């Protein structure tokens, strides 16, 4: 499982590459859909299911996965998004129930906030 420190180190690589190239079976980067909170939550639930089916992993919310340059790729997650509500949404919309662990990660780019969602096997 990736730690916040691991993610911070990986984000440095965005200066010379794209997040999609950093992804693997247990790591995914997703842009937060700022236009539709419902769509963003639906995507989050889908990612939780994918990670659970794949044996667990970490999803980094707030990073465009096909954009080069750290400042361009890190868009962030709006500060009003409540991680407790995200956790409840994933739990309520999955069967069997998935209980993700969320963590805020401060960054200087975008909204200044990324969210890490960890799914344990």
PLM regions with names:
Residues 1-121:
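Conserved N-terminal catalytic/coupling substructures associated with nucleotide/phosphate chemistry
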């Amino acid at each position: 499982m990736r730690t916040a420190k691991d993610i911070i180190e990986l984000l440095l690589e965005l200066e010379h590459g794209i997040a999609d190239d950093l992804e693997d079976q247990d790591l995914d980067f997703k842009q937060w859909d700022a236009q539709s909170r419902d769509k963003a939550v639906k995507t989050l639930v889908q990612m939780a299911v994918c990670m659970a089916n794949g044996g667990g992993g970490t999803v980094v919310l707030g990073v465009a996965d096909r954009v080069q340059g750290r400042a361009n790729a890190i868009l962030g997650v709006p500060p009003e998004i409540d991680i407790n509500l995200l956790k409840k949404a994933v739990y309520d919309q999955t069967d069997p129930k998935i209980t993700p662990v969320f963590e805020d990660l401060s960054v200087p780019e975008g909204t200044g906030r990324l969210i890490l969602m960890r799914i344990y096997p």
